[in-house]
Regions:
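Substrate-binding cleft of carbohydrate-active enzyme catalytic domains
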Residues: 1-192
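Substrate-binding cleft/loops of secretory-pathway carbohydrate-active enzymes
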Residues: 81-91, 152-153, 195-223
């Protein structure tokens, strides 16, 4: 169940109400194809909105379970996070100098804005979200995304570069490996297993992760 993306945060998280107050709303671009939709400007009203309440999620999970269907939640990280960062912009790299809005389309270089891997508050934030997600979904698995993480800001972010130096990481790809491993370990500490997209194979794969292939006919996942 794809619950979050650049274009909207779609699950109620009690600890972080701005995720749905801000992150679940976006500007309207009537008549425009998805790739052609201009990004939100600061102060522009957001009229397209919607999200699942926690009661909605419980109802969906129960309906599916009655039909022997397992609902696996996906919480994207470190990319596809514009909606979350529109709500909590301090979780982006401090070098981001543009307005972060919920993207109505592909977003262009605004899609470069992802969670800061050098900021410990990011991990606390995501762990708290995982806590609420685990309480709602009985599935054995939690999907953590991991795809299409552009490293534009990580390369110039002092916090990310300090993290790389501290952890002995060779490059920003390894920094994503650190990010995903840290979050995977947290998910596993909750008794769940991790799923992710095939970009996780670009560096050390989190132990036991189930890889979903979407590039190159799934060859990375196959390996």
């Amino acid at each position: 169940m794809h619950l979050v993306d650049d274009n909207g945060w779609r699950i109620e998280i009690k600890k972080y109400p701005l995720l749905t107050e801000i992150g679940a709303s976006r500007v309207e671009r009537p008549g425009k194809l998805f790739p052609e939709r201009r990004n939100q400007r600061q102060g522009e009203p957001t009229v397209e909105k919607g999200f699942y309440t926690q009661d909605d999620i419980r109802e969906i999970v129960a309906y599916a379970a009655a039909r022997r269907i397992e609902v696996i939640p996906e919480i994207e990280m470190p990319a596809h996070s514009n909606a979350a960062l529109a709500a909590y912009p301090l979780l982006a790299c401090p070098v981001v100098d543009k307005f972060i809005g919920v993207l109505p389309g592909l977003g262009g270089n605004h899609a470069d804005i992802i969670y800061c891997a050098g900021n410990d508050s990011v991990f606390t934030f995501l762990q708290n979200i995982i806590d609420e997600v685990v309480a709602l979904f009985p599935s054995k698995y939690i999907h953590l995304g991991g795809d299409e993480a552009r490293k534009t800001h990580w390369k110039v972010c002092p916090l990310c570069q300090a993290r790389m130096k501290k952890e002995g990481l060779k490059n920003e790809e390894d920094l994503q490996g650190y990010f995903m491993a840290r979050m995977s370990n947290y998910v596993k500490s909750k008794g769940r297993e991790v799923m992710g997209w095939d970009e996780l194979t670009n560096t050390k794969i989190p132990d036991g992760a189930v890889i979903f292939g979407w590039q190159g006919y799934g060859q990375a996942a196959l390996k």
